[in-house]
Amino acid sequence: LVYAYKKNKLINPIPIKFTKNIENATKLRKLCESKIKTKVVGFKAGGTALPVLKKLKEKEPFYSAIFKNNVLKSGMGVKINKSTLGIEVEVGYLIDKRFFDNKGVITMKNVSKFITHMMPCIEIVGYRQKKQGIKFLGDLASDFGANIKFLIGPKKKFRKINIGNLKCNIKNIKTGNVVNGNTNSVYINPLNSLRFVLS
């Protein structure tokens, strides 16, 4: 997987023993991430869609590192392949350095005080393996969180809004297809996903 990441190539699927159990998948992800020398610029919550968690019989999502070389600016292109699963609209948060001095428990009530800015993001989701579909949450978690690239939008100073019920849509300009979504399908809401990552 590290070779596939560094060389931007697809490899044969890794053995199921690394993906069927989320704990094994997490250990593999952490090991692979430790072999990447590029700067870590953030973290993402993955597998946050409640229907997916229920289908895969998992109780909570996972998190993974976002490396600097995987972050794109608006207008840049992304190469996709048959192992690309799709794209997701995300909410990104910029966290104040004070958070790292915090010794208390992160809750839904206090998580907001550590946020300085928020921004829209688009994540390109997929594997670095020659496989498709999702049988286990570990399929995603083990493969660098299934994060291929991150497109970061303009950041805005954080203010409290009803982030738990924001509608959004993505349009494919070439085909005209429109996909609608809502933040209420994301592990209750994006702030709860952030609380999970920070905890």
Enumerate the language-model features and the residues they cover.
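Glycine-rich phosphate/ribose-binding loops and adjacent secondary-structure elements
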Residues: S199
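Catalytic-core "active-site belt" of small-molecule-metabolizing enzymes
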Residues: L1-R195
